[in-house]
């Protein structure tokens, strides 16, 4: 499903446009810190003026097609927001040895570059951990991308979802650990996002906001997945903490069917159709 390209200059980020269309324990819930106040619009505009408005390619072989018109392109990641769910449809990022940084703080903020009605504020998570046993889970990971120039945007709630603690601190973080280790020697392109296949619960302090039923992640190394070095995973929100992420490998086609997205949108159709129906060979590099 292709949509008309429509790029609009953002405030503290590079672009907002229509797109043809979570490390070690860093992902673990931390005590909530006081939300910062976004700088006023003129200050953000001045920041933009000081930086060349160049789009970073965080997708490698085309960003997913079939999401919304709210696409944010940042140094750390590219994100497509869903104003209905209040979470991203997908988040894509490029991880390398130089993109990593440890010890980055978690200061949760509402995304200043989305309409306030289309994303969550920190108060939305009040009481969620106690009531639902969920953490604030990064989609683009903080440790793996903390070396980015705009790493603070990793803590914007547009990049966060309420993820069960057993998943966030279990199979999901172990996959992130392997992803980060792999990026020490190779460029890793990843796209990830939530699933809403059944009703589980709503955030207690955000009426009507459903928590995702699961998550998906697709990774490839090098310049293209066409050489077979890719892997895709789907993990249910209720995945036990001790589960092995290797047991949740799927095909890219399965993820496309569940999400309605077209992944790797710039790949030639004949190549895409072939590899998307396969599980790929990257899982062995991830310890599977």
Protein language model annotation of sequence segments:
Residues 71-136:
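Short, His- and charge-rich active-site/binding loops that engage polyanionic ligands
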Residues 116-288:
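Domain-level detector of nuclease and nuclease-like folds
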Residues 17-18:
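C-terminal motif of bacterial Sec signal peptides marking the signal peptidase cleavage site
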Residues 21-89, 95-96, 269-288:
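N-terminal module-boundary/linker segments of secreted carbohydrate-active enzymes
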Residues 23, 98-99, 221-223:
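Short regulatory "switch" loops immediately downstream of catalytic or recognition motifs
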Residues 9, 59-64, 197-204:
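Short Pro/Gly-enriched beta-strand edge/turn motifs at strand-loop
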Residues 4-13:
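Sec-dependent signal peptide recognition
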